[in-house]
């Protein structure tokens, strides 16, 4: 289960991570009351355990998300993915004038001390999680 997704962002997370391609049952809860965020979304994926790249993608799309591994209707493990300071070869810079769109250079994105906003390593274009596009 992916918990603490920003309100109305679960469809984007589901589509971007291609979770429906897993062939597992998926349930989406939109606008669930939250004491911390007022409203939040959740994704329930039956019998799912993400790899490290998927965990990183989750935190890039939903910075406050928690991944809960559920077995026999109990939370077995909570994973709070953290943003590294540099993300390489995973995300595209949204700036159309960035060198990464015309030259063969590695795609690199900086996070300031593991926080938002993201910043392109080359053009220093700053953007937030709602502008993330993966390679």
Where do the PLM segments sit?
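Interaction interfaces in information-processing and related assembly proteins
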Residues: 1-79
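Cys/His-clustered metal-coordination modules, chiefly Zn-binding fingers
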Residues: 73-135
């Amino acid at each position: 289960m992916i918990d603490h997704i920003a309100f109305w962002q679960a469809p984007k997370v589901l589509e971007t991570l291609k979770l429906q391609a897993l062939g597992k049952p998926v349930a989406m809860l939109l606008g669930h009351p939250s004491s911390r965020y007022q409203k939040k979304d959740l994704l329930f994926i039956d019998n799912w355990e993400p790899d490290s790249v998927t965990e990183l993608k989750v935190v890039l799309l939903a910075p406050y998300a928690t991944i809960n591994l559920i077995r026999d209707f109990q939370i077995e493990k909570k994973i709070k993915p953290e943003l590294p300071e540099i993300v390489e070869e995973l995300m595209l810079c949204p700036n159309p004038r960035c060198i990464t769109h015309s030259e063969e250079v590695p795609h690199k994105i900086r996070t300031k001390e593991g926080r938002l906003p993201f910043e392109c390593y080359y053009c220093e274009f700053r953007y937030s999680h709602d502008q993330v596009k993966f390679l």
